[in-house]
């Protein structure tokens, strides 16, 4: 019985662990989606976890994409990922020189913290992302210059 319990717990730990991929950013599609080319010359479409950036036709959509491009285009990145979304994209946290690019998009006011997927984040990351969004809102950075910016999850339902 104990052995079974230990085996079950070990398998759960394995599920929760993130996989990692590294490569160079070869495309920035919008403020929360990129393509990474790994050392085997395989392209991976990456959806930045924990954030939702304005759609391209929304206010700040092109600025969000440009900000992300400035941060990571043609740079070496590491992606810590745990799953694929329904579109086949790898969902993960993108790191450049150890810095969380997803968080930087929120901090710059170029994306919302995506509360719908907060359960996928650690408690520490939830606090960081929430604080970054609140700080950007208070400072009226990026999309927060508008009093009530329309979030992309509502815009997509139109």
Where do the PLM segments sit?
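Small beta-barrel nucleic-acid-binding modules, primarily SNase/OB-fold domains
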Residues: 2-5, 10-158
């Amino acid at each position: 019985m104990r052995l079974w319990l230990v085996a079950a717990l070990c398998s759960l730990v394995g599920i929760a662990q993130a996989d990692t991929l590294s490569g160079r950013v070869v495309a920035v599609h919008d403020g929360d989606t990129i393509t990474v080319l790994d050392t085997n010359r395989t392209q991976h479409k990456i959806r930045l976890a924990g954030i939702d950036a304005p759609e391209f036709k929304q206010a700040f959509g092109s600025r969000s994409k440009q900000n992300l491009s400035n941060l990571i285009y043609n740079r070496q990145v590491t992606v810590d990922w745990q799953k694929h979304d329904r579109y086949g994209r790898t969902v993960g946290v993108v790191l450049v020189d150890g810095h969380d690019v997803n968080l930087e998009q929120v901090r710059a006011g170029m994306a919302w913290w995506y509360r719908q997927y907060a359960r996928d984040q650690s408690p520490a990351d939830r606090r960081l992302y929430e604080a970054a969004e609140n700080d950007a809102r208070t400072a009226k950075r990026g999309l927060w210059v508008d009093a009530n910016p329309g979030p992309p999850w509502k815009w997509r339902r139109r």
